[in-house]
C-alpha cells in the first residue's frame, strides 16, 4: 500500500495546481516541428487529456497514453477540462491509448469516449503483476512498435 501513496499525493497536487502544470506542458509543446506526438504515462495522460480537451494546447498530431486513468476520471466526472454529458471536443484525436489488464491503474478509452472517432485502445502484456505492471510499459517492445505504427506521416 505504501508504494501507492506517492501517486495519491501527485494526484492531489495536480488537482490543486493543475492549471500551472498544463501551462508548462503547453509551453513545451509550443513551436515544435510537426508532427507533434504527446506521450503521457499515468497522471501524465490525464494532464495531456485535460490540456488538449480544454483547447489550451498547440496542435498535437497524436496523443499517446499508457497506463492512464483518464477514461476512469471521465467516467466518474472527475476530469477538470470536460464534464460527463458534455460534447467532448475532438482536438486530442487521434489518440492511441495503451493499456494492460494486469495494471489496475490502466483503463480503456474507446468505450468510455464512445462516438468519438480516432481513439484506439491497444493492449500490451508485459507479464508482470501489479504494481510492477504500471511501470512496465517502457520495458515492452510492443509499446514502441505501436507508437511507430501510429506515428503521423507528413
Spans of model-derived segments:
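Lipid deacylating catalytic domains
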Residues: 1-39, 43-154
